[in-house]
């Protein structure tokens, strides 16, 4: 089995929902409990044995590039997307050629990873990976375990654990935030 040793960290967003804080600072550098949001994910990745992380940048990119230059683990490569905001899927597709077809993690830079100290969430995700049976593995959280989330959720799980997308009252898919 091939475990992921590389991650993509999505950090290019405009941070509109956190304005005015993000008018002068990219959202991944906003501190939560004294620690920039991006470090929560990068530290979790390093703890799970991830060696390389590609971070895409766009909005206030120089600040992120300067900040990330001080990290040693995981090793950071920058995907500079200042010329065109690619959104999440575009940011992933843009760096796929660098990954050589191997499994990888994708994390949003504006989330923080907490969990059981004995088995952090990212480690649980890594340990659940089975490339002989999976093409993708998505970590979700029950609403009562989601930190700082007050919505109705994005998915429901059937009895076999398969996820189905929640729909709003009109039948349209709800916005995904994972």
What residue ranges belong to the model's regions?
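The conserved beta1-alpha1 loop
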Residues: 12
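Conserved core of the sugar-phosphate nucleotidyltransferase
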Residues: 76, 114-178
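Conserved catalytic-core motifs of eukaryotic protein kinase domains, centered on the activation segment
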Residues: 20-23
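Glycine-rich "HGGG/HGxG" loop immediately N-terminal to the catalytic nucleophile
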Residues: 15-17, 132
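Conserved N-terminal catalytic core of the sugar/cofactor nucleotidyltransferase
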Residues: 1-9, 17, 31, 35-108, ...
């Amino acid at each position: 089995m091939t475990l992921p040793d590389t991650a993509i960290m999505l950090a290019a967003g405009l941070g509109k929902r956190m304005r005015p804080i993000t008018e002068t600072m990219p959202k991944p550098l906003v501190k939560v409990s004294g620690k920039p949001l991006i470090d929560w994910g990068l530290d979790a990745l390093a703890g799970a044995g991830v060696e390389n992380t590609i971070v895409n940048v766009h909005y206030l990119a120089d600040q992120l590039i300067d900040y990330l230059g001080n990290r040693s683990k995981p090793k950071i490569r920058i995907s500079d997307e200042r010329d065109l905001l690619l959104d999440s899927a575009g940011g992933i597709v843009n760096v796929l050629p660098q990954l050589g077809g191997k499994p990888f993690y994708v994390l949003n830079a504006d989330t923080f990873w907490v969990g059981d100290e004995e088995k952090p969430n990212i480690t649980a995700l890594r340990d659940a990976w089975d490339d002989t049976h999976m093409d993708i593995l998505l970590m979700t959280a029950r609403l009562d375990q989601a930190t700082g989330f007050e919505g109705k959720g994005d998915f429901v799980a059937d009895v076999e654990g398969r996820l189905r997308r929640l729909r709003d009252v009109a039948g349209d898919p709800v916005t995904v935030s994972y």
